[in-house]
Amino acid sequence: MMSNDIFPNKFKAALAAQRIQIGCWSALANPISTEVLGLAGFDWLVLDGEHAPNDISTFIPQLMALKGSASAPVVRVPTNEPVIIKRLLDIGFYNFLIPFVETEEEAVRAVASTRYPPEGIRGVSVSHRANMFGTVPDYFAQSNKNITILVQIESQQGVDNVDAIAATEGVDGIFVGPSDLAAALGHLGNASHPEVQKTIQHIFARAKAHGKPCGILAPVEADARRYLEWGATFVAVGSDLGVFRSATQKLADAFKK
């Protein structure tokens, strides 16, 4: 029997303690690039299932690639749907980023999808990758309290309901989706617009008022540092796709121009 090194969830504990967590977005859907990210020293990595070409078959090798990494894998699910979340739990994810949460009811649904009864509605399989195929004896006793739920606020309705969402039991943090939020506020492609920035600051303040850490994606260093000053706890400061695109263009330009 293998030793159980999956509990407690250190990322969840770090968020609860309001310790700064610096992360990176993983969008290339490739185990090699994900493994490289896992060697860099980030506290957490988002494996994107909403906008990146990921599915169960691509997530599993990426989780394997991060097995020895100190970086906590966080999966952004394609949608807030219990069956999708159940399958991602079963393959070994413990940290979830739920996109486009607009109401308290949607936040409650997200939490319930990750919990076994009676606390939730997660379906039960006795042998899967997450419990090392039945070799973790305390898995069912430990699972519910070791799942991290981060919900994204990225619409006007979400902003309007941020207090109720942040107060939802089982929600571990509030994450701002700056691009969709900008679009919702009428500033598509311009997350730096003053109205968007003011709204981000408001979301951070409301999350803090409920004792919940807040996070954001900020690939521009000046933005990331400003959000940290505003009280953000978990910030993704770049993406593998962005770094790769920028570095390859810079290399080509050095010789072609």
From Swiss-Prot:
One Pfam family, short name: HpcH_HpaI
Site (Increases basicity of active site His): 90
Pathway named in the protein's UniProt entry: Carbohydrate acid metabolism; galactarate degradation; D-glycerate from galactarate: step 2/3
Spans traversing the lipid bilayer: none
Record bears the keyword Cell division: no
Highest taxon in the source lineage: Bacteria
Signal peptide: none
Entry EC number(s): 4.1.2.20
GO molecular-function terms, A-Z: 2-dehydro-3-deoxyglucarate aldolase activity; magnesium ion binding
InterPro entries hit by this protein: Aldolase/citrate-lyase_domain (IPR005000), GarL (IPR017648), HpcH-HpaI_aldolase (IPR050251), Pyrv/PenolPyrv_kinase-like_dom (IPR015813), Pyrv_kinase-like_dom_sf (IPR040442)
Keywords: Lyase, Magnesium, Metal-binding
Cofactor, how bound (note): Binds 1 Mg(2+) ion per subunit.
Cellular component terms (Gene Ontology): cytoplasm
GO terms under biological process: D-glucarate catabolic process; galactarate catabolic process
Gene3D superfamilies registered for this protein in UniProt: Phosphoenolpyruvate-binding domains (3.20.20.60)
Named cofactor requirement(s): Mg(2+)
Site positions (Transition state stabilizer): 76
Reaction catalysed by this enzyme: 5-dehydro-4-deoxy-D-glucarate = 2-hydroxy-3-oxopropanoate + pyruvate; 2-dehydro-3-deoxy-D-glucarate = 2-hydroxy-3-oxopropanoate + pyruvate
Binding site for substrate: 152, 179-180
Family to which the UniProt record says this protein belongs: Belongs to the HpcH/HpaI aldolase family. KDGluc aldolase subfamily.
Function: Catalyzes the reversible retro-aldol cleavage of both 5-keto-4-deoxy-D-glucarate and 2-keto-3-deoxy-D-glucarate to pyruvate and tartronic semialdehyde.
NCBIfam families (UniProt xref): GarL, PRK10558.1
Subunit structure: Homohexamer; trimer of dimers.
Protein name in UniProt: 5-keto-4-deoxy-D-glucarate aldolase
Native organism taxonomy: Bacteria, Pseudomonadati, Pseudomonadota, Gammaproteobacteria, Enterobacterales
Name of the gene: garL
